[in-house]
């Protein structure tokens, strides 16, 4: 399994201490006046469907509501979907983007500015209302709902931007709805829109997994892994992570990362590359490969160039190899095994020592990974596939759970 999301989650959890007291809906509905409760309970049954296609990205299918193209530019398409409410659902398609977390936040901010301009009032306050994650078929999504106030005093008005994002193949879909209530139908419309982009890629992965990630009881995002073999039997590993973590009542920290690496059939690393975007800024990017019989790393972190040889010049375990070694240890009489891995989120210029051990007496875990001061307890099936795990850091627990597996 990919360890980078675990390190990233820990770093975010330790810096965003307020998350320990939050929940999925951060503001209890009971604290609002009756008119707000009534508005939030609104629903509508949308039976109409419309045909949708976008040939340039091979999208085609039925969308709930009546969809129409409003605007397009190079690599961007903007649609309205009429669902019978005063405000239409707005959907964007991008083929260039920062990621599901950063781009979702940017579109929400754009929508908040648009609401202020439309009403001729300044944005006077905003609050994180809800964050969630899940899957539509095999496609993970993020949810970010934002309660906002415009104006001051007796002129103050309230509203809510509901928003979802999902990445499908080479495009990112984001939908927003500036209406109180209608939460269920908005998700149904978004799901139908996303499903039109879910065509099977030419080189389908032989294994794919999506993990939900939580801090205590707070949904914070997802991690995706895809494994594809080439003609020589080598394995390409594609992994992506998208995280939204509340910093306080008004703001969220955003992280998107993407990795591509190659593994030999025996689980040894060939090479790899990774990048991370934090809060709209490319915070790091690295590549690792063998040069002159040494592992060499090139890249940058916070704009500072990095070029170094690892002190370790031996075998490195790939993410694919971690599955193989887990399955092997489960079958053997041995209690533990040690490896070296390149985990740039922990240290980009070092090979991290990993100890994989069996766990007994714990109904929720049969294995654990020791990474220095951090320990991940997890449950793996006999074939090595990770099902769920937890890492404790003081009062904070980082949970990972498989919510989709294929292969």
Named regions from a protein language model:
Residues 1-22:
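Gram-negative bacterial Sec-dependent N-terminal signal peptides
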Residues 38-77, 219-299, 384:
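N-terminal mature ectodomain segment of secretory-pathway/periplasmic proteins
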Residues 57, 169-205, 401-407:
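Surface-exposed amphipathic alpha-helical segments
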């Amino acid at each position: 399994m990919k360890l980078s999301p675990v390190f990233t989650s820990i770093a975010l959890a330790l810096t965003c201490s307020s998350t320990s007291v939050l929940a999925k809906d951060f503001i209890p509905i009971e604290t609002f006046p009756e008119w707000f409760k009534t508005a939030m309970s609104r629903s509508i049954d949308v039976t109409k469907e419309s045909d949708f296609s976008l040939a340039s990205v091979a999208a085609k299918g039925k969308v709930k509501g009546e969809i129409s193209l409003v605007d397009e530019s190079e690599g961007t398409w903007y649609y309205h979907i009429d669902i019978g409410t005063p405000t239409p659902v707005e959907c964007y398609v991008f083929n260039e983007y920062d990621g599901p977390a950063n781009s979702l936040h940017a579109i929400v901010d754009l929508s908040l500015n648009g609401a202020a301009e439309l009403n001729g009032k300044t944005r006077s306050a905003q609050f994180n209302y809800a964050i969630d994650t899940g899957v539509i078929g095999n496609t993970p999504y993020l949810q970010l709902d934002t309660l906002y106030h415009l104006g001051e005093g007796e002129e103050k008005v309230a509203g809510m931007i509901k928003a979802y994002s999902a990445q499908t193949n080479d495009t990112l879909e984001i939908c927003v709805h500036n209406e109180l209530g209608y939460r269920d139908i908005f998700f149904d419309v978004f799901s139908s829109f996303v499903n039109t982009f879910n065509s099977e890629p030419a080189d389908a992965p032989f294994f794919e997994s999506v993990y939900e990630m939580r801090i205590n009881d707070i949904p914070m995002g997802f991690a995706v892994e895809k494994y594809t073999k080439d003609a020589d039997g080598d394995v390409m590993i594609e992994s992506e992570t998208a995280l939204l973590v509340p910093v306080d009542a008004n703001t969220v920290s955003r992280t998107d990362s993407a990795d591509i690496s190659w593994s030999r059939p025996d689980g040894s690393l060939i090479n790899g590359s990774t990048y991370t975007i934090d809060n709209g800024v490319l915070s790091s990017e690295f590549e690792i490969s063998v040069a002159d019989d040494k592992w060499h790393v090139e890249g940058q972190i916070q704009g500072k160039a990095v070029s170094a040889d690892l002190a370790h010049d031996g075998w490195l375990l790939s993410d694919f190899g971690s599955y193989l070694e887990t399955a092997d240890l489960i079958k053997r009489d041995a209690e533990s095994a040690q490896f070296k891995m390149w985990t740039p989120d922990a240290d980009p210029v070092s090979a991290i020592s990993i100890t994989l051990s069996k766990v007994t007496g714990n109904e929720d875990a049969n294995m654990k990974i020791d990474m220095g001061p951090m320990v991940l307890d997890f449950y793996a099936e006999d074939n090595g596939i990770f099902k769920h795990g937890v890492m404790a850091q003081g009062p904070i627990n980082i949970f990972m759970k498989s919510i989709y597996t294929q292969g």
